[in-house]
Amino acid sequence: MFERYKEDIQCFMEHDPAARSPIEIVLLYPGFKALRSHRKAQWFLNHKMPFIARYISQRTAHKTGIEIHPGAKIGRRVCIDHGNGIVIGETTEVGDDVMIYQGVTLGGTGKDLGKRHPTIENGVMIGSGAKVLGPITIGRNAKVAAGAVAVSYTHLRAHETS
């Protein structure tokens, strides 16, 4: 787990020109705090303690403005920059080396059972205010433009921009 924390810190240092030091990221960056808390919540969920997992998730959302469901799968070196207003749903899968900016929703479109949230492949950038809804896939290294809306049954191929 600590290796992933180090990777996350390095990711923020590399992608945020305003980041001055690792201690600044650990203490002051809501995106880092939300990712750290998500990993704890997911551990509790995986060990059959869903109430504790949801408690951690909701407490973190209240503190950071970033709501990540404990069931969401988040890859390595994911950066959440200016994290206010981010929602990541239960069956969302986020790959490695993904950048997520403020106001992004990775959400469902209803009360369907099973896979109902997006899959974000490696290397994707999701711009500010983008809404990616339903069980769709955003392909490797794609860029979802700020304010874009991508809905169910759409497949944005690798290296495309919405």
Language-model-detected regions and their locations in the chain:
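Left-handed beta-helix
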Residues: 64, 69-70, 75-76, 81-90, ...
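Terminal amphipathic alpha-helical/low-complexity segments used for targeting or macromolecular assembly
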Residues: 1-64
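Conserved small/polar residues in nucleotide/adenosyl-binding loops
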Residues: 154-161
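Residue-level marker of positions within ordered structural domains that often coincide
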Residues: 45, 103, 161
